[in-house]
């Protein structure tokens, strides 16, 4: 099922990264990630990123393959953080690249036109490289203050988001970092095609309600 990256509000769920190098398919945290993926499919979340950086390659592959079986044939697209090789081997839809990943152009050349590529960006320069390097979309942030992104300094806010979206339009940009239900509409108004989040979209039991509320608030806005 194709994904329309130009149709807001796109919702991009990122897993919490609470697995460890001791996680196995038999441990609870492995199952928790898969439960979240199942909830995402049920809530028709557009994109899910498996962002579990502490897992061994073997266990990450098993997790990605299990998640891929859940999302296959649904409206939810599955991306794996950084590891384009594991994403392809596990049957995921694509990869989410970071500042330290392989260059976007190299991944596109290696894995082809149908491989979905998202890229984390923190400036207009980085977003521009992602755009012209062959990414399908960029995630820009942190837009707002968030404890998990302190290393990136003062957040650019909606002004920074607007600048990036305007400069690269119609290239899809999603807002990340401190995004809440109350700020989703502001991000869309600034030019973002949607939002990416960890905390706002968890736990699994609340995901359907949160997604419905995002869509309801968007529908009530005039853009």
What is each model feature region?
Residues 1-101, 109-136, 163, 169-172, ...:
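Conserved N-terminal beta1-alpha1 strand-loop-helix module at the mouth
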Residues 51, 141, 177:
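Active-site flanking residues adjacent to catalytic metal/cofactor-binding acidic residues
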